[in-house]
């Protein structure tokens, strides 16, 4: 794959709006992986991005009457639930004001959240961090739903594993390059998640809660290039 094809693979400007480009989803996926590794390794061993594991932890806490586990898992679940509701209620109304302004607001909000979380002392209850991240991740999940025409989830990997493997088999059967492209797109999401999670766990050993600030750096980069691509997209539309 040459440089031009690789650029189109991640940033197909001709066919898709700025909020539907694969590079953006890979960045959000690496941030989600970072958050998942951070909360699991440093903040009570909960999963902020996907709630299936937390419901298992909640059930385990109830069965063993571990109140700390119940409280942590339940707070994360409720935060995720509220994040979905919040994004669903306000995103479309806000975007009526200006094209994709909600997406920019959400990225900026995510940045502020992660910066603030880095100042929380290690002795603070885990719920402060887990609630904030779960709420933010849920809003991202509800807001960024499609990349390059494909349904994409930004906080977790289960569907990406299914799609990457299923479309690879379909490619082998048909030799249809579009199916290989879909498989590789989902695989890039998985690799992005692994990269983010690995970085957070590694850096957390040295910087503890301050490690969350690396995800702030990722968000600054994402917000900058998203705003830039939006500006270019609007300029092309006016021609």
Name the predicted role of every residue range:
Residues 2-239:
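Alpha-helical transmembrane segments of multi-pass membrane proteins
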């Amino acid at each position: 794959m040459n440089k031009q094809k690789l650029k189109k693979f991640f940033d197909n400007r001709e066919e898709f709006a700025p909020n539907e480009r694969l590079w953006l989803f890979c960045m959000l996926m690496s941030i989600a992986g970072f958050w998942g590794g951070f909360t699991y390794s440093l903040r009570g061993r909960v999963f902020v991005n996907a709630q299936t594991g937390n419901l298992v932890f909640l059930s385990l806490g109830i069965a063993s009457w571990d109140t700390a586990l119940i409280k942590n898992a339940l707070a994360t679940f409720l935060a995720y639930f509220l994040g979905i509701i919040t994004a669903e209620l306000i995103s479309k109304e806000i975007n009526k004001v200006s094209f994709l302004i909600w997406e920019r607001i959400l990225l900026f909000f995510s940045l502020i959240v992660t910066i603030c979380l880095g100042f929380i002392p290690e002795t603070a209850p885990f719920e402060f961090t887990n609630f904030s991240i779960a709420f933010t991740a849920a809003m991202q999940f509800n807001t960024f739903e499609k990349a390059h025409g494909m349904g994409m989830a930004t906080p977790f990997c289960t569907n990406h594993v299914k799609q990457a493997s299923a479309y690879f088999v379909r490619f082998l059967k048909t030799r249809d390059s579009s199916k290989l492209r879909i498989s590789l797109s989902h695989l890039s999401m998985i690799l992005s998640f692994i990269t983010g999670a690995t970085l957070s766990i590694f850096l957390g050993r040295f910087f503890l809660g301050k490690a969350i600030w690396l995800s702030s750096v990722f968000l600054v980069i994402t917000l900058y290039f998203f705003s830039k691509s939006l500006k270019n997209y609007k300029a092309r539309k006016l021609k």
